[in-house]
Every structure is written in C-alpha cells, then in structure tokens.
Amino acid sequence: MNVLVINGYCLSVNSSANLCHLAYLQGFVDAGAHVSLLSIDPADYPTDLSMKIPDKIDCQYIRAISLYERLSRFKKGISSADEQNTEGTIAASSRSPHGLLQSIKNRIRTLYGPYGIDKAFYQKCKRFSCSKSFDLVISISHPPVSHLAAYMFLKTSRIKAKHWIQIWEDPWYSDVYGFNSQERVRLEEKRLLSLAEKVCYVSPLTLLNQQKLFPESAEKMFWMPLPAYYKNATPVHKTSGRNIYGYFGDYAPAARDLEPFYTAADKAGVEVNICGNPSNLFHSTDKIHIHPRLPLVELRPIENGTNVLVFLCNRQGGQIPGKIYQYSATEKTILFILDGTDDEQAVLKDYFGKFNRYVFCQNTVEDITRAIRQIESGDIGSVRNMPLDDFEPAKIVTSILEAGR
C-alpha cells in the first residue's frame, strides 16, 4: 500500500502533537506500507534531534515560514538590541521600530483568515505536485491546514489517490483552550469535514461532541486511540525505596487544573517532578521540583527516574491528552486523574477501566490524597503495572484502515 501523510507543521519541533505524528508514521511503516511524507522544511525552525522521522519514509518538504514569523524573528532581534541600550530611555512607542513592526504584524495576521499563519503551508503547497499514485492520503491536524492542503491536491489532481482520511487529534472550533471559538472557524471546520471521505478522532467524547456539532458529517466520523510512541519501557525502580511521581506536559489553567494534585502531593510529602508550561504557577519545595518544558534529551533522565506517572484529564471538551497512551506502554504505575463533567468522567472510566491498568481518582485534593496513599501502601487492587500492546502504532493504524473502508 502506498500512503501519503500530509501535515502542515515542522515535525522536528519538540511537541506532544509531533510525537503523536511520528507514531502514526511509524505505525504505517510497521504495518508494511510504503510511506511518503509532505511536511514543513525543518531548516526554518528550531529542531530537537530526538524528534526523528522513522526510516524508510520518503520525505518531501515545503519551505513555508510565514511573513508573520519572519517579522517576529526580526522583532526579537530589535528587542535584544534595545535591551542593551535601555539606560536613559523610555518605553518604545508605536513610532519606534518595535511598535511599527507589531502594527505590521497585526495587520498581516488578519490576512491569513481562520487558519492563521499556518495558511502559509497551503499557499506554498500550490507549487507542489507528485506523479506518484497513492492508495491512501492521510491528512493530520494539528494544524487543520493539513486537511485544506490535502483537498486542494486531490481536487486539482496534483496528487492522485484512491481514498482520503482526515485525522483530527484535536477538534478546531471546540478546542480545549477556547482559542478558536469563532463562527468563521466553525464554518470552515464544517466545510473541511464535508469534503472528507472519512474522519477519525482520538477520543470517544470528542466523537460524540463533533457528531452533535456537525450532524451532516456524523456518519463518516469514527474514533481510534492515539498510537504510543514509546518503544522500550525503562526499568522500574524505586530510589532509596521511595516512589517518585512525575507530571510531564503543559498545564495551562484554562485546559487542565493541576493545583489539586500539587496540593495533595505537598501534603502527602511525596517526591514529584513537574515538567511543562507554564512553569510559574507553582513553586518548588524540598520534594516538588518544577521545570519548564524540556528538550527530550533533558526530559528522558527525569522520566526514567520516575516510577509513578501522573495523567491529568482536561477540564472540559472530551479531548484525551495523548500521554495516557504513551504511559500505558510502560511498566510504571499510572495515577489517572479524572476531570470534566460527570458524564465525561463516566465515559473515560468505562473505556480505560477495562484495562485494569490505572489507579483512578477525581480531581480533588481529597481523592488524589486517597489515591496517593493507596499507591504508597502498594495496595492498588487488581491494577496491573504491565505494558499494554493495545496502542502499538501498527495496531492503531491497521484499525484506522479497517474503520476507514
């Protein structure tokens, strides 16, 4: 099978979304497909050498850095120069180079429409064509412009393919942060969905919500878990006989409420590493260590020294942070903190509970404290700290192909 994967982002940038993108690519390779990738050229972006595209993939890159991004980098250069000459000056006004550039940037951003600066990928893709025929095109968002580019290619026959599946790791209009709740975004998402042959989401709750929001496309929608990117689980061990807890991921209050866990962990006196942004919401203590988002090469030693992984659900929206699938591939204890409405929590616990893999609790100080005590005592009932193979990339990709027929 010849598969073309389209993603309008630089896959060498360190992000949770990119780790999932790479896992999809690995899944297609492991499933025996001949995989081609069309993505953004890493030459224009800060890359993490640990973010490696799987071997055996034919990579085609688009130079798609936007004018907005170029001006942002130029502005940073001016700001750095200003910092060296601030003595005896006043704040920059709109007539300064800094203020003028910001004004130009704001005007330019409005020209990109609902896609924002990601629209540059679509614009540059208009120059691309491929003589190879594909059995399947997979467009993956984030960002949603991946789907727009895929449609343009297929409509104009710049790319020939038998089938097309859209994978939405996050919905657009109803994203968990609420940044895209504009009518023009809803209408464009509706249009993109109407163009697709099949649409795959990564959460049962997101599927239900999207089917209600876009009933005209409901029949073509299905859901499938994200593939796990961990390949070799690190050995589990206790340092000096104690557990070390780890929360790895962002925790902006609009999306995730980490404060109950922080408070419960502090009161319980357990050792914790929290790695992610924003890193200024909580202060470090003797046992709780706060870190910003780290490159993988710096994050790995901390992850390897952790034997209790903390997973926190989103406040609302039904989206499932992809880390739960990655953690499930390890032999480590997983503290699964439920959040959202009662109905959302019930759906998540019903699905994940069948694996007997997680120690569940609600996102309150009291219930998290109970779960921590349970873990510390070693009394976790029928929970088995064994790797699940249900989320292996090849299995997930095969299931997507079967559901997409």
PLM feature spans:
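Nucleotide-sugar-dependent
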Residues: 252-256, 297, 301, 309-328, ...
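N-terminal subdomain of nucleotide-sugar transferases
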Residues: 1-68, 198, 259-268
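Donor nucleotide-sugar binding/catalytic pocket of nucleotide-sugar-dependent glycosyltransferases
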Residues: 163, 194-234
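Conserved catalytic-core segment of nucleotide-activated headgroup transferases in glycan assembly
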Residues: 229-232, 238-283, 293-296
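Membrane-proximal helix-turn-helix segments that form the acceptor-binding/catalytic region
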Residues: 23, 127, 145-148, 166, ...
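Acidic anion/phosphate-binding donor-loop and adjacent secondary structure
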Residues: 49-50, 69-71, 177-180, 222-242
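A conserved catalytic-core segment of Leloir-type glycosyltransferases
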Residues: 43-116, 120
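A charged, aromatic-enriched C-terminal amphipathic alpha-helix characteristic of glycosyltransferases
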Residues: 359-404
